[in-house]
Amino acid sequence: NKVALEQEVYAARLYLEIERVRFSERLSIEFDIEPGTEKALVPSLILQPLIENAIKYAVASQINGGAIVITAKKFGHDLLLEVADNGPGMTINNGLVKNNDSGVGLVNTKERLAALYDNDFALVLTHNQPRGLKVNIRIPLQLEQTEQKNA
């Protein structure tokens, strides 16, 4: 089930509003959504487990909280999504989290992407600079079809 990116971002904002009540000023949130990507089709709730992981490992685990940046941009014929945090980070081996405590969110996300896009996707974890973790998703850019209405 795919939705327009603008719907996915709206759902993410609602979830993060709840988390902001919980963490108050300890949670910093930034959205960087490139104009023209709003109608891109993405799997429904694809950002949710990534944001939940960032909350759990980067914000809740730090006394001073943390920051989460959610980015979407076009790259050729692809859509790039990124959830980055400034938490303590994790041990990464070949783009995968090395420890077993990364939860099922990333595994489920990868399985969903594989089911929807076969081999035409990427899910990669990298170190955020100066600290933290970045989860990057690359999927084919597909735009929501707008209905033509008779004049």
Where are the model-predicted features located?
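C-terminal end segment of the histidine kinase catalytic
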Residues: 128-151
